[in-house]
UniProtKB/Swiss-Prot annotation:
Ca(2+) 1 binds at residues 67, 70, 72, 74, 76. Its EC number is 1.11.1.7. This is Peroxidase 43. The record marks 62 as: Transition state stabilizer. Ca(2+) 2 binds at residues 190, 241, 244, 249. Gene3D superfamilies: 1.10.520.10, Peroxidase, domain 2. CDD domains: secretory_peroxidase. GO terms for cellular component: extracellular region. Disulfide bonds join 35-112, 68-73, 118-322, 196-228. It comes from the Eukaryota. It is found in: Secreted. It comes from Arabidopsis thaliana.
């Protein structure tokens, strides 16, 4: 029995080492005794900020994803430590929402000094943002601690819009996420916008001779080129979900199937057998009557993502200000 327990501990350790998924003591309601108002404070600040910025749900959801994919979900993307700051990495281009996290942190420090981590604020804010976009409500396991490292060189393996589906699957697998998780987390693009900067190659240099990506629906191509003309303003933004950019739903998956994906990486989900099957599984007439719904599976995927490389116990710290190490 002792030998069996030892083997089990070794197996769990290997899962953590190779995949970065922490099996440590995150738990729903972690702050119920030490700061019982923590989650309500996060929700109130996020809801108030969203009144003046309808894009905030997408902004905070993206911030959570980018935080977790570098050094785990430890708030490392929030730190300002000069030119080497992780947030300055090209892979984090356009990531925003830092001031919202700081606003939440300031209120939490006033109510419960030194208790709630910045990394938990990011995860909770993303949850509340999704709810504001009419997405699923879910419980967030908390208890993360903040990392003590923030360096742009560590963000070199962030998923990029030009990545092939094979590269994307490999990058997600490195984080302990499978092909199904890839589809579900990519479907977070159901809310938000992207810049024409990320569209140039797909529209004007995808094939020899300056031809566009052939997977773009021919009826959609003129719309994209009008919004993002060749040699035009690369900072112009367009919705990633053509029909419901501010509503969290599975329309993005239908768009991917029909050739209306805006991003190359989203379109690639329908070019791979495994990910195509996942996309189709949420679009059949029998879904959601038979099998899990897109919303329920998305919750599982984002909670799973929120456990990547977390620091708990005596690891890391609880920052007093999210933009600076203690």
């Amino acid at each position: 029995m002792v030998w069996a327990n030892a083997k089990m501990r070794l197996a769990l350790s290997l899962v953590t080492v190779f995949f970065g998924i922490s099996l440590a003591n995150l738990e729903v309601g972690f702050y119920s005794n030490t700061c019982p108002q923590a989650e309500s404070i996060v929700k109130r600040v996020v809801s108030g900020a969203a009144l003046s910025d309808p894009n905030l749900p997408a902004i905070l959801l993206r911030l959570h994803f980018h935080d977790c994919f570098v050094e785990g979900c430890d708030g490392s993307i929030l730190v300002n430590n000069g030119a080497i700051s992780e947030k300055n990495a090209f892979g984090h281009e356009g990531v925003r929402g830092f001031e919202i996290v700081e606003a939440v942190k300031a209120e939490l420090e006033a109510a419960c000094p030194g208790v709630v981590s910045c990394s938990d604020i990011v995860a909770l804010a993303a949850r509340d943002a999704i709810s504001l976009a009419n997405g699923p409500a879910y419980e967030v396991p908390t208890g993360r601690r903040d990392g003590r490292v923030s360096n742009m060189s560590l963000a070199k393996d962030m998923p990029e819009v030009s990545d092939s589906i094979e590269i994307l699957k490999a990058k997600f697998m490195q984080k302990g996420l499978n092909a199904k998780d890839l589809v579900l987390l990519s479907a977070a693009h159901t809310i938000g916008t992207t810049a024409c900067f990320f569209m140039s190659k797909r529209l004007y240099d995808f094939l020899p001779g300056g031809q566009p990506d052939p997977t773009i629906n021919p009826t959609f191509l003129p719309e994209l080129t009008t919004q993002c003309p060749q040699n035009g303003d690369i900072n112009v933004r367009l919705p990633i979900d053509r029909f419901s950019e501010r509503l969290f739903d599975k329309q993005i998956l239908q768009n991917i199937k029909d050739g209306f994906a805006v991003l190359q990486t989203d379109a690639g989900l329908y070019e791979d057998v495994t990910t195509r099957q996942v996309v189709d599984s949420y679009l059949g007439m029998l879904n959601p009557f038979f099998g899990p719904t897109f919303e329920s599976d998305f919750v599982k995927a984002i909670v799973k993502m929120g456990k990547i490389g977390v620091k708990t116990g005596f690891k890391g710290e609880i920052r007093r200000v999210c933009s600076a190490f203690n």
